């Protein structure tokens, strides 16, 4: 039985495009469907654009493996495709003695995960790198950095198309019906259609659960409950005296409000974590005081009134 595609990927964010690229370069006839007018319009455009080294995940877990291997592959991909990045490094900073044990645990976890370039620093060593910090010690991750996420996604689109695949915008996924040797996929948009594929990959981010529910016969008990973890960012007016990413020790469910500077030089702090019931990307100005107090734990020199609401993202949480 012939099919229209070897694989259809739903969702043209960073994950969906990476799936499309991996399939296309292995000779698969691939289409990546995206309901929006541009790629990366969801989670992939509302985050910190940080390349993590692999410190935070349990040894032996898929997250640990994918983060460490993926980080190495990502830097190589960015080099090959001339996508901008800054391997600036990251400091995870303890501001009180009670947080030092968390740094030791992260260092041990990083070693178990095979993370390169991780160094435990005392207060003097930390201040030698970033004198404006308040700290009693830190963990330095030399392999962490920031990158141009949109440039990365554009490069993935180019690779998919160069290998004969297609990225189709304005094409919402309406549902699918598996048959014996193929899957019928219903597509909306200006010209609704039904196509067939051997494989269907749902990379719909915040809509992934809804999409899975429209696949006929897919077990409902295999669709995990979704929780919206909103994170707001505040931009800094003026200059921040840091050359590296600055993070607190992680908190349950998140990495904590951190400092990062994008490739254009804009400094931001965020994200926090607020569970919400609906997709709401407005940044509440009333959260500014909380952000100021949080940031001053590690940067006591933050000027009054220097933070302004910037943007928010929503992370899909399964727990």
Predicted features and spans:
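Helical element adjacent to the flavin cofactor pocket in flavoenzyme catalytic cores
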Residues: 139-199
């Amino acid at each position: 039985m012939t099919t229209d595609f070897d694989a259809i990927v739903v969702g043209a964010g960073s994950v969906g495009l990476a799936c499309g690229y991996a399939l296309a370069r292995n000779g698969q006839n691939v289409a990546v469907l995206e309901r929006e007018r541009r790629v990366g319009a969801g989670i992939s455009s509302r985050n910190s654009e940080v390349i993590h080294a692999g410190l935070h995940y349990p040894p032996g877990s898929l997250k640990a493996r994918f983060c460490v291997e993926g980080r190495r592959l990502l830097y190589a991909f960015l080099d090959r495709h001339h996508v901008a990045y800054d391997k600036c490094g990251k400091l995870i900073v303890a501001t009180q003695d009670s947080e030092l044990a968390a740094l030791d645990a992260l260092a041990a976890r990083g070693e178990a995960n095979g993370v390169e370039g991780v160094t435990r620093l005392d207060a003097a060593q930390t201040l030698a790198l970033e004198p404006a910090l308040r700290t009693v010690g830190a963990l330095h991750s030399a392999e962490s950095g920031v990158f141009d996420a949109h440039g990365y996604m554009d490069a993935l689109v180019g690779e998919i198309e160069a290998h004969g695949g297609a990225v189709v915008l304005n094409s919402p996924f309406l549902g699918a019906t598996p048959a014996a040797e193929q899957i019928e996929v219903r597509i909306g948009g200006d010209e609704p259609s039904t196509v067939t594929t051997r494989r269907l990959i749902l990379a719909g981010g915040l809509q992934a659960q809804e999409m899975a529910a429209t696949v006929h016969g897919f077990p409902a008990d295999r669709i995990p409950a979704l929780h919206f973890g909103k994170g707001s960012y505040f931009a800094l007016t003026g200059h921040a005296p840091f050359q590296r990413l600055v993070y607190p020790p992680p908190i349950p469910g998140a990495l904590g409000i951190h400092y990062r500077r994008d490739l254009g030089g804009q400094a931001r702090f965020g994200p926090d974590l607020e569970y919400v019931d609906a997709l709401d990307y407005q940044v509440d100005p009333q959260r500014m005081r909380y952000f100021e107090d949080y940031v001053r734990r590690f940067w006591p020199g933050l000027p009054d009134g220097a933070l302004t609401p910037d943007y928010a993202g929503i992370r899909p949480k399964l727990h």
